[in-house]
Amino acid sequence: MLDAFAKVVAQADARGEFLTNAQFDALSNLVKEGNKRLDAVNRITSNASTIVANAARALFAEQPQLIQPGGNAYTNRRMAACLRDMEIILRYVTYAILAGDSSVLDDRCLNGLRETYQALGTPGSSVAVAIQKMKDAAIAIANDPNGITPGDCSALMSEIAGYFDRAAAAVA
């Protein structure tokens, strides 16, 4: 796992060069935007159980076959596993937001997840829908202007959306 800083340094080191002005400017901007990033992660983390529960509730309302006998979320044990997986994905998305890089999400959460779901007979498309629902809720919470560092957060919200989209694509 590399954060944005370690990744840029590793790339420059591999080339045997100093950081370019563009790389330095990008890292400087990341530092300037750090409070917004921390605010977003704090808000998502503080509301994680609500985000997961509401996304699951909406998913099961749209796809009730998942919670009916024979469905992948039928029985308390399977439902708990579903909620746990959603929470884990959300947690790793927050790690990626904090790091400003998707490698922690990819390396520790998404790699091999589609194959695991296929082996278990879990419909990846349903998991992808749940992730999209978590994305919508997380962005709404993180982008609420009340009590957050002032300034334009559109680039950060786009970045956050990208992490959720990456997770959804990995399981679909």
Curated annotation (Swiss-Prot):
Keyword Chaperone assigned: no
Record-listed N4-methylasparagine modification sites: N72
Matching CDD domains: PC_PEC_beta
SS bonds (residue pairs): none
A GO cellular component entry from the record: plasma membrane-derived thylakoid membrane
Post-translation changes: Contains two covalently linked bilin chromophores.
Localisation: Cellular thylakoid membrane
Membrane topology: Peripheral membrane protein
One Pfam family this sequence matches: Phycobilisome
Keyword Electron transport applies: yes
Annotated binding of (2R,3E)-phycocyanobilin 1, by residue: C82
UniProt keyword terms in alphabetical order: Antenna complex, Bile pigment, Chromophore, Electron transport, Membrane, Methylation, Photosynthesis, Phycobilisome, Thylakoid, Transport
Gene Ontology biological process terms in this record: photosynthesis
Binding-site list for (2R,3E)-phycocyanobilin 2: C153
InterPro entries: Globin-like_sf, Phycobilisome_asu/bsu, Phycobilisome_asu/bsu_sf, Phycocyanin_b
Function comment: Light-harvesting photosynthetic bile pigment-protein from the phycobiliprotein complex (phycobilisome, PBS). Phycocyanin is the major phycobiliprotein in the PBS rod.
Family recorded in the similarity comment: Belongs to the phycobiliprotein family.
Subunit comment: Heterodimer of an alpha and a beta subunit, which further assembles into trimers. The trimers assemble into hexamers.
NCBIfam families: phycocy_beta (TIGR01339)
Classification via PANTHER family: C-PHYCOCYANIN BETA SUBUNIT, PHYCOBILISOME 32.1 KDA LINKER POLYPEPTIDE, PHYCOCYANIN-ASSOCIATED, ROD 2-RELATED
UniProt protein name: C-phycocyanin beta subunit
Organism expressing this protein natively: Thermosynechococcus vestitus (strain NIES-2133 / IAM M-273 / BP-1)
Source lineage: Bacteria, Bacillati, Cyanobacteriota, Cyanophyceae, Acaryochloridales
Gene symbol of the encoding locus: cpcB
